[in-house]
């Protein structure tokens, strides 16, 4: 096993670009959007626009730090540098926790999607199989991960664009009845209780699911340590975020809700598949099921990659067991991949014990972890700016826009989301679990890391360049 050699820079601009595209298209869109639609109705489009604006500010804050100092471990390392070791410890492990929880949601969605074709097969069997498959692939060279993400992302993007064009074609050419008795068109956005049928309360409630949908997009910052030219490719990837949000979330859900009455969109599978199946277009439903399965596989792949690299960075800083920093001959932190695979077996157990309730529970907990990570990223960027002179700020190659008002508004929005989780009964458990997790991390740091602080822990350095 390699220990002296660092992570390999095996991710090209093409890999990073499509990872940026693919990270916006996952379980939160293909499955979780059904719950968000039921909460807010067509007004969910506003929730995605507002949440997307806040997420873009998070990504720009992360991009400023990642371009300034591209390292393995990314924002966990930045938090240690600018907010202190405890903050880095809490942020790094909360991100790893987020990836575990999100991955459990993703493997659960994979099992649900497979039920479209094989309803008689127990879901936990599919979950177990995909955990072993993706875990094995992540033990390969990082280029294998990059290539897999490239092709899966290409498939997802192509399918979304094709679905949007097909939906617009159905509306434009008067394909208003497909044997279902339902009208097709923009009238569906207003005919079933209005554009905001559940009021402002429904719109606010949907933020818990909407923010979960954006979770994982920060993986672009984690890839900085393995990107061949981070100062060029990361800004391009991050600046494409607003367009991706408009295309993949707002326009996509707009078309879906125009095609089919939103009150009849259920949660027994992907709403994308349901709508085309109910419209009588069975072949399109089958193709879309392949796409959503691919999206779930891609998301699981990214989850394992992101958590593994964060734990590797934590180990370099002395915030995780030293074994997590061991590399295979392919330059992969193999121990962290094994740990992630073992953690995902919890998902297998949950799908065996409570198959009907597992997704909502996991998604709400993931929302807490996701928003906590974003809040810490924003606070870290503010702390970095405060530590810099005017000359240093002027030399930043990718500065955050609308400083300081943009980051301040994004910070306030993240705090607001915590309030949403605590206010609505369905998500209160997530806030409780999240608070317990943070308290556990604080206690763990004080008992484990702080006594060793004077022993001189290794510091994360930029990954070595291997072309």
Swiss-Prot record:
Keywords assigned by UniProt, alphabetized: Amino-acid transport, Cell inner membrane, Cell membrane, Membrane, Symport, Transmembrane, Transmembrane helix, Transport
Cellular compartment(s): Cell inner membrane
GO BP annotations, alphabetical order: amino acid transport
Membrane topology: Multi-pass membrane protein
One Gene Ontology CC term in the entry: plasma membrane
Reported function: Major high-affinity histidine transporter. Binds and catalyzes the uptake of histidine into the cell. Functions as an histidine:proton symporter with high specificity for histidine.
Transmembrane segments: 18-38, 39-59, 71-91, 99-119, 125-145, 155-175, 200-220, 245-265, 280-300, 334-354, 358-378, 402-422, 429-449
Effect of deleting the gene: Deletion of the gene severely impairs growth on histidine.
GO molecular function, one term: symporter activity
Reactions catalysed, as given in the entry: L-histidine(out) + n H(+)(out) = L-histidine(in) + n H(+)(in)
Activity regulation, per record: Transport activity is inhibited by the proton ionophores carbonyl cyanide m-chlorophenyl hydrazine (CCCP) and 2,4-dinitrophenol (DNP), but not by valinomycin, nigericin and nonactin. Uptake is reduced in the presence of the sulfhydryl reagent N-ethylmaleimide (NEM). Uptake is not affected by arginine, lysine, proline or compounds structurally related to histidine such as imidazole, 3-amino-1,2,4-triazole and urocanate. Only 1,2,4-triazolyl-3-alanine reduces the rate of L-histidine uptake significantly.
InterPro entries: AA-permease/SLC12A_dom, Amino_acid_permease_CS
One Pfam family recorded for the sequence: AA_permease
Species, as recorded: Pseudomonas putida (strain ATCC 47054 / DSM 6125 / CFBP 8728 / NCIMB 11950 / KT2440)
Name of the protein in its database record: L-histidine transporter HutT
Impact after mutating residue 212 to Y: No change in activity
């Amino acid at each position: 096993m390699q220990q002296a050699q660092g992570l390999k820079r095996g991710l090209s601009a093409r890999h990073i670009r499509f990872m940026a595209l693919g990270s916006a298209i996952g379980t939160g869109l293909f499955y979780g959007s059904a719950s968000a639609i039921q909460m807010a109705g067509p007004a969910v489009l506003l929730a995605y626009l507002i949440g997307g604006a806040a997420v873009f500010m998070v990504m720009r804050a992360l991009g400023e730090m990642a371009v300034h100092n591209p390292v393995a471990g990314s924002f966990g390392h930045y938090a240690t540098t600018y907010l202190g070791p405890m903050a880095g410890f809490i942020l790094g492990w909360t991100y790893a926790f987020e990836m575990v929880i999100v991955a459990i949601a993703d493997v659960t969605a994979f099992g649900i999607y497979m039920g479209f074709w094989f309803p008689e097969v127990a879901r936990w069997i599919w979950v177990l199989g995909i955990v072993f498959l993706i875990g094995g692939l992540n033990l390969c060279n990082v280029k294998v991960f990059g290539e897999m993400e490239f092709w899966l992302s290409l498939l997802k993007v192509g399918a979304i664009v094709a679905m949007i064009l097909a939906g617009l074609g159905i509306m434009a050419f008067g394909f208003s009845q497909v044997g279902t008795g339902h009208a097709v068109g923009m009238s569906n956005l207003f005919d079933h209780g209005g554009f905001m049928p559940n009021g402002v309360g429904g719109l606010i409630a949907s933020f818990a699911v909407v923010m979960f949908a954006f979770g994982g997009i920060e993986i672009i910052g984690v890839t900085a340590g393995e990107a061949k030219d981070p100062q060029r490719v990361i800004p391009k990837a991050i600046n494409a975020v607003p367009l991706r949000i408009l295309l993949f979330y707002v326009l996509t859900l707009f078309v879906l809700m125009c095609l089919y009455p939103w009150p009849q969109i259920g949660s027994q599978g992907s709403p994308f598949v349901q709508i085309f199946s109910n419209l009588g277009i069975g072949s399109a439903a089958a193709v879309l099921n392949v796409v959503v399965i691919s999206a779930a596989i891609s998301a699981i792949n990214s989850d394992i990659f992101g958590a593994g690299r964060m734990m590797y960075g934590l180990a370099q800083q002395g915030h995780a067991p030293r074994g997590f920093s061991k590399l295979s001959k392919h330059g992969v932190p193999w121990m962290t991949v094994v740990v992630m695979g073992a953690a995902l077996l919890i998902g297998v157990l949950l799908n065996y014990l409570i198959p009907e309730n597992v997704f909502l529970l996991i998604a709400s907990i993931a929302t807490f972890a996701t928003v906590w990570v974003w809040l810490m990223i924003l606070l870290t960027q503010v702390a970095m700016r405060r530590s810099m002179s005017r000359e240093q700020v002027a030399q930043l190659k990718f500065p955050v826009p609308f400083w300081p008002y943009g980051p301040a508004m994004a910070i306030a929005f993240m705090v607001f989301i915590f309030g949403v989780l605590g206010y609505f009964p369905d998500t209160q458990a997530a806030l409780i679990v999240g608070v317990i997790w943070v308290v556990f991390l604080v206690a763990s740091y004080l008992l484990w890391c702080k006594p060793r602080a004077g022993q001189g822990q290794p510091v994360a350095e930029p990954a070595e360049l291997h072309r």
